Amino acid sequence: MLDINLIRNNPELVKNDLKKRGELDKIAWIDEILRLDEEWRKKLKEINRLRHERNKIAIEIGKRKKAGEPVEDLLAKSKEIVKRIEELEKEVEELRKRIDYYLWRLPNITHPSVPVGKDENDNVPIRFWGKAKVWKGHLESFLEQSQGKMEYEVLEWRPKLHVDLLEILGGADFARAAKVSGSRFYYLLNEIVILDLALIRFALDRLIEKGFTPVIPPYMVRRFVEEGSTTFEDFEDVIYKVEGEDLYLIPTAEHPLAGMHANEILDGKDLPLLYVAFSPCFRKEAGTAGKDTKGIFRVHQFHKVEQFVYSRPEESWEWHERLVRNAEELFQELEIPYRVVNICTGDLGYVAAKKYDIEAWMPGQGRFREVVSASNCTDWQARRLNIRFRDRTDEKPRYVHTLNSTAIATSRAIVAILENHQQEDGTVKIPRALWKYTGFKEIVPVEKKEGCCKA
């Protein structure tokens, strides 16, 4: 939600930002907001004038009564004023609703460093890490995707896709999950279950070491939390509703964490508030028909460890960089080659002022795929959820800035581990950082196993 004062004081900035985002149909909204706002302020001014006049009449009525003079004319006039005030208050309320309709549907103002573009093809890679394993048939494409800025090892044998590795390793059952729940669901089995849990504890431990408070949030939230955290379009495309209840299954722990301090004034000395949450996530994935229909990359249900920060406005951009660095460190420990991408205006979404994605190299697929998103939402969520802070009790509260970043979405991290650490025979080596959590150092194909999860 945007600050109405920003639109009053700098409407051209807002219009230009909408143009950069490709939201051309909303540019006319700004003039309409200004027109409604001017009318709203005029009516408020008239209400205040009438209240002042009514107070003067009340004083005059008191004087006349004391003097034994008639007051009927003044009482009639006061009654008319009260009636007019009531009418104006209704008009003001209606104008406020119309203004809020637009304010609640406008995207955040982008940071100047966000590249202008139409879609994901215009996102800008800003750094690369690791030594990629590249099948010779993918080499030309890899060199283009990595801009020649990444070390690589050419493989003569073709790496398998994660969905095929899961079958070879006995790690998932998609057919029975489809029977029970439909498409984009899965049963995880055997060592992959332990790997999923290991990734959760690994990410939690690393972030707790950095001062984050661990949280398991509610897995369902009320509508006001979702409305405050995301866009209305997500209610159709992403979020599952519980029938007959004012409850929604969370698509990410970001949302219950954003709602955690709704309608609160925080003590400035407590900022920043650093949270790391574990939760399952539930997503409709509407509008993704035909994309990643096999495997566990794009699914309706998955586990995720999420970073979330409540920050002072002047510190939020520093925290944005720190959050993405935290996630990078996790993937470096997992020995997953990746690139960090600055997301362009057309792919940014409404909530974030700036977003970085970490995209892991997937040798089986021969391309980089998103595994982390890190966003600075500035005060967009805080205004909708009314989250403020102050340093002194006599100080006017200010809105906090909220930031979020994936630490690890386990299903996508598993995809990256399987594809990057596979051997030619289908065995998958477990990254050293996870050994103490898994209790085993590799996963071997089913035909070579003597039992699950052997060291």
Swiss-Prot record:
Keyword entries, A-Z: Aminoacyl-tRNA synthetase, ATP-binding, Cytoplasm, Ligase, Nucleotide-binding, Protein biosynthesis
Subunit structure: Homodimer. The tRNA molecule binds across the dimer.
Subcellular location: Cytoplasm
Annotated protein name in UniProt: Serine--tRNA ligase
Family indicated by similarity: Belongs to the class-II aminoacyl-tRNA synthetase family. Type-1 seryl-tRNA synthetase subfamily.
Example of a GO biological process term: seryl-tRNA aminoacylation
EC category: ligase
Gene3D superfamilies per the UniProt record, alphabetical: Bira Bifunctional Protein, Domain 2, Serine-tRNA synthetase, tRNA binding domain
E.C. no: 6.1.1.11
Source superkingdom: Archaea
Originating species: Pyrococcus furiosus (strain ATCC 43587 / DSM 3638 / JCM 8422 / Vc1)
Reactions catalysed: tRNA(Ser) + L-serine + ATP = L-seryl-tRNA(Ser) + AMP + diphosphate + H(+); tRNA(Sec) + L-serine + ATP = L-seryl-tRNA(Sec) + AMP + diphosphate + H(+)
Binding site for ATP: R283, K284, E285, V299, E370, V371, V372, S373
Record text about domains: Consists of two distinct domains, a catalytic core and a N-terminal extension that is involved in tRNA binding.
Record's keyword annotation contains ATP-binding: yes
